Structure formats: C-alpha cells, structure tokens
C-alpha cells in the first residue's frame, strides 16, 4: 500500500513538473553568428531565420531582441581601435565635405581636400581600418559625392562581427545610389531614394544646394537597410543605425553610429 501511494505521488509529481516546465521551456532561439540583427528560431523541429526589429540585436541571455547602444560622443567607433572622426560642411568651394572635414579629425591623413572629395581623399591606400571608400572625382560637384570621375566603386565598412561592402554607382545626378539608384543618394532601396539624398529632402549628403546639411538640419535617423546588396547579396536586415546631428549651414556636425552591446 505504501509503495502504491508513493508511486502515485511520484507520477503526480512528474505530471505537475511537466505541466510547469511546459510554460517555462528553454529558449528555442539561437544567435546568428553572421548577423546579430537576426536569430534562428526552432518551432516544431523546424528552424527559421527571423529578423529583429530595426536597430535591435538578438540577446541570447534574454532570448529576445534588444535595442542597440548609441555610441556616445563624436565620431564613429566600432571598437576597431581607430580614432573617431568628425566632418564639417565648411571649407569647400563647391559642396562636399570640406577641407576641415574628415581628414583633419582622424579619418585619413590627407583628408577630403579643399575641393571636395578629391582624387586622393578617401582613396584605397590612405584610409584606416574602420572605413575604406573608393571615390573618384576632383570635387563634389553640386553637393553630391563623386559627380565626376569614376562611375562606380565600393564603400567598405568593417564591423566587429562581419566585414561588409556596400556597392554604389554614380546615378543621373551624381549621388551614391545603391546599384541602380536613379535619383542619387545612398538609399535603402535599389530603385533610388525619394529625393536623392540621405534621408532629407532639403540637403544632407547630396542635396542640390551643396554639402552636408547646407539647407536644413541633419537630425535624421538613417539606416542601411540591406537592399544595398552587401557583397552582391540581398541582406534583409538593418546593418547599422546612423544618426547625423548638427545645426545645418556651415556648422560642424557629428556622425554617430549604433553598435551592439558588449
């Protein structure tokens, strides 16, 4: 009788434990080693790749996507050991980033040059480990990048988790386009951005009036959204979140980037 009672209690205990654990199962998600903005989820034995919401990365500890951290201070820092850089819209005669822009603050030794981008500004042999851009042209034309010079190239951003190449082509009005951008601008769609600029209809990286934010401010939250075909492959997830802040005109602005939590 005692054995029967003990066996009944044991069975009931196992059933209760199973019911309890069913609502508290282990995380059925795992991180994506290639892209922290996504994760793999297993449901009914089938594993599916899922994307986190914009500007969030998967946290294996919480088993959820969490917001990324905005790097404080000026410049852009992906923990590459390089100096942060700043840019300024002053010092350029025809648009572009200006003589007192990136070069003077740690991006490249010879800088962008007084005439805009410059042929030896962001060249292949004179960049740091964080950013490597291949841009042509003697100046930034009417405010766009490389309106004259080479018609194609690549913009390489080295992230701590995966090197990434964003291809660009010179479009009809000289912006950065993403493969087939028809109206210029570095955009999130392969068909071209709405206004030929980086998220601003009045300027900001290639507006008709000149350099960065020369007519209007730079308070734009921008994202590389993946259709920019890194390494020729559609990448259906945000790559990084960039905030450009400043007051417009010839004032100096600050480029800040989001990064994952350590």
UniProtKB/Swiss-Prot annotation:
Bias kind Low complexity: ranges: 185-203
Region described as Disordered: spans on this chain: 172-212
Compositionally biased region (Gly residues): 174-184
GO cellular component labels: extracellular region
Subcellular location(s) per record: Secreted
UniProt signal peptide: 1-21
Protein's name according to its UniProt entry: Glycine and serine-rich protein 1
Organism: Lottia gigantea (Giant owl limpet)
